[in-house]
Amino acid sequence: MKKILSAIIALALCASVAVGASGCGCEKNKKTAKNTTSTSSGPGYKVEPTNPDFEEGQFGFYRLNDNEVKVTVYNGNEKNIEIPATANGSKVTVVGANLFQASDIESVKIPEGVTEIQKHAFSSCQNLKEVNFPDGLKVIGENAFWNCKKLEKIELPSTLKKIEWYAFSATGVKSISIPLSDTLSTLPEKVFFQCSNLSEVTLPLSITNIADDTFAECADNLTIKAYTGSYGVSYAKNHNIKLEEMPRS
């Protein structure tokens, strides 16, 4: 009888331990699918790149569908980079998260066909001086070029739909002209935060929403150039930023 009672008690204890383990959230510690990236979004956070499905040349690629791939890994040591337009017969449409983060590259050519640059793709590339942004680019992810101190010239395409927060913060950009676009109307938080050399920003009529701290801690002589009667004019006045009004044609 004692042996039977002991066995019952042992089984009850095991059941309670199992229930506790399943309710503690331990399952959350299991690895997620290979196309999942870290949700950390602050400046300087490391975002794990997507594991590639295949490699070609010095790059690794993740297959998005039958016709498109994302470049996720760079295995070379070149300083002047040309991202391929195709890989294994598929079009390269996405520059993956963390692809070149903290590398010593100096220039990068992004091919036509790329529509998205994901978060942290080029963050903390301290020697990066030149980037071409192709026509057709729609999204620049958060922190994509954060802390690229030598990146002084940025020319954005009119196809942009979204620039995410901190995208160009702490870069060396001196002036920026936001392109007139039917799809880009907002500049979110801290896009140009701590751009200490940024002294001139030209805003189109299409920009109708700018976060309070988009241009925080930029150059003391920062000037916003905006069209008379536009949102940009009122933004500059409300934030005590030097204003140069441009007449509407």
Q: Each PLM stretch: what is its role?
A:
Residues K2, N29, N35-S38, H120, ...:
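Asparagine/serine/threonine-enriched low-complexity, disordered tracts
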Residues K3-C26:
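Sec-dependent N-terminal signal peptides of Gram-positive bacterial secreted proteins and lipoproteins
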Residues A18-P43:
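Sec-dependent signal peptide cleavage junction
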Residues G42-Y74:
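Short beta-strand/loop segment at the start of cytosolic alpha/beta domains
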Residues Q58-F59, L64-N67, G76-T93, S103-E116, ...:
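Structural signature of tandem-repeat unit edges
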Residues G96-L99, Q118-S123, G141-W146, E164-S169, ...:
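Consensus positions within tandem repeat domains that build extended binding/scaffold surfaces
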Residues F215-C218, H239:
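Acidic, glycine/polar-enriched metal-coordinating patches/loops
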